[in-house]
């Protein structure tokens, strides 16, 4: 964990008012202006985390067929389907992931017996910095309290909040990453971690991680394993998910024509959930908790 503090030039009251204005801003230019002012005048204490190459994250696609190409596992999304989201502006391509498969399943609409889904494991191919706005601690410093107020924006539910959070995310991962003063301390910010809207515990595992287009397109993170899963048991408080087939990027997993290769056989060394294996999930509030460790990112 690295805390990046900016020398504060405004009074605490002035900063608090700026954050309040930011939480109400409904214009992209105004959001960017307020963010830039807060950054250059010392507005908040940033919680940054360094993750190593090899870190893995999950992405689930709620569609029944296996998936044929990498794009079928959420990246790059077709621009015509890129409506405004919590961390992307309309038409903007980003990669949404989660450290926890249970979080991905929790955000699906239903878990009925026979439901088939695609699950991809995305693996970082280089080290990267992640801005964490999912932590909810009791801040002590004034700059920490201001940062906490900024975090609260990512807890709000409803499309009308997305204008602010999508612009804020793009600003942190885009414009700010090109800031010379920032790059003197670290090599840009490639990802942002924010709380799942369905989180009912304080665990950071119930969070999502979004990656900027530049990092993904440059090969900073790639699809390394792909799964075809099926719900074999489902109830109000528990469910069981089984691997029907999977593939590996490192084992001739992509054919010459760019199609993914699937296997139902025993080649499972390195697989998080081998073929035929099952994982039971128990519900805690709105969150599905696996009965075995599946987290690959911490």
Annotated model-derived regions:
Residues 85-86, 94, 109:
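N-terminal accessory/assembly segment that mediates macromolecular interactions
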């Amino acid at each position: 964990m690295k805390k990046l503090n900016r020398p504060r030039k405004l009074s605490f009251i002035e900063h608090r008012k700026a954050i309040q204005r930011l939480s109400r801003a409904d214009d992209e230019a105004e959001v960017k202006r307020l963010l830039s002012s807060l950054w250059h005048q010392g507005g908040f204490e940033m919680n940054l985390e360094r993750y190593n190459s090899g870190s893995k994250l999950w992405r689930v696609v709620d569609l029944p067929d296996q998936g044929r190409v990498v794009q079928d596992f959420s990246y790059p999304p077709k621009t015509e389907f890129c409506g405004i989201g919590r961390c992307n502006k309309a038409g903007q391509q980003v990669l949404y992931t989660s450290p926890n498969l249970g979080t991905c399943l929790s955000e699906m609409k239903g878990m009925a017996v026979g439901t088939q889904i695609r699950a991809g494991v995305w693996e970082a191919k280089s080290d990267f910095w992640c801005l964490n706005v999912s932590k909810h601690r009791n801040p002590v410093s004034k700059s920490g309290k201001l940062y906490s107020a900024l975090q609260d924006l990512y807890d709000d539910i409803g499309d009308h909040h997305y204008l602010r959070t999508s612009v804020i995310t793009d600003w942190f991962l885009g414009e700010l990453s090109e800031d010379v003063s920032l790059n003197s301390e670290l090599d840009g910010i490639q990802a942002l971690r924010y709380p799942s809207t369905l989180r009912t515990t304080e665990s950071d595992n119930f969070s999502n991680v979004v990656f900027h287009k530049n990092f993904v397109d440059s090969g900073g993170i790639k699809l390394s394993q792909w799964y075809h899963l099926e719900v074999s048991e489902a109830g109000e408080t528990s469910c069981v998910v089984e691997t029907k087939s999977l593939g590996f990027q490192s084992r001739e997993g992509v054919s010459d024509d760019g199609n993914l290769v699937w296997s139902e056989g025993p080649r499972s060394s390195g697989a998080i959930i081998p073929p035929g294996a099952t994982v039971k999930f128990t519900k805690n509030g709105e969150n599905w908790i696996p009965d075995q460790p599946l987290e690959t990112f911490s």
